[in-house]
Amino acid sequence: SANYPLGNYPLSAMCIHLDYKINNHWQLQYSLYNGLAHKVFEKGNNVFSICPSQEGIFNISELSYQQNRTYHGLYSGGFTIHNRLYSNNENGEQTLEEKKINFSGWFYLEQCLFKKNQKEINLLAQYSANLSINMGCKRYTGFGVTLSNIVFSSKENTLGTFINCARYTYGREVSYELTWKICMKKNFNLQPAFHLINNKEGTFSIGMLRASYT
């Protein structure tokens, strides 16, 4: 999303999405966006615009495999094609580069490492690369772990940590997240989170609290 401002609020782009389940394990997803996003309710903008000749197109394709054994896992990979390229400059603004075909690819993994009774440890990993841009994010790597009923006495209380590194053409940004999902009642959860972010501008911290009801 750092290189493609198509679904980042307040921007929105028209999309056609296909989700096809091949069998109990394999799934294919395909999304085709208008290549330029527009602001909602802004005069002169139309979020339902479809104009490939002037605004280009943006394609996302993903193939995933899920296993449902004791040590369950989810593995997915995909690629994007975009022929209207926006990039972030050092001031965080979006600038339009020369129109050209732009490719990127990624891989995502969720894997159960340990499961016994109600105790569970899961690994998360993701990687993406885009080598065809002059500005913006060229590589992204992330690793995380979730602990269910390991630190706390209930599986509904889960501790998670995640570290990711984004390599931009103008520098590197590393961030850490520590979060704790607390089951308050059967259908109500609280999830405090703490983020630590480091880049060439310095080190910054963010705290947040999420609430969910299902």
Segments and roles (model prediction):
Residues Y20-I22, Y65-Q67, Q111-L113, L147-N149, ...:
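Residue-level signature of outer-membrane beta-barrel architecture
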Residues L28-N34, Y75-I81, L123-A129, F143-V145, ...:
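Transmembrane beta-barrel strands of outer-membrane/channel proteins
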Residues H25, Q67-Y75, F114-I121, N149-L159, ...:
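Short loop/turn motifs that connect adjacent beta-strands in outer-membrane beta-barrel proteins
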Residues T203-T214:
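Outer-membrane beta-barrel "beta-signal"
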Residues S1-F58:
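Surface-exposed coil loops of outer-membrane beta-barrel proteins
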Residues M135-N189:
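C-terminal hydrophobic structural anchor segments
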Residues I16, S61-L63, F107-L109, L123, ...:
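Membrane-embedded beta-strands of outer-membrane beta-barrel proteins
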Residues S53-Q54, K99-K100, A129-Y140, R167-E173, ...:
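Solvent-exposed loop/turn segments connecting transmembrane beta-strands
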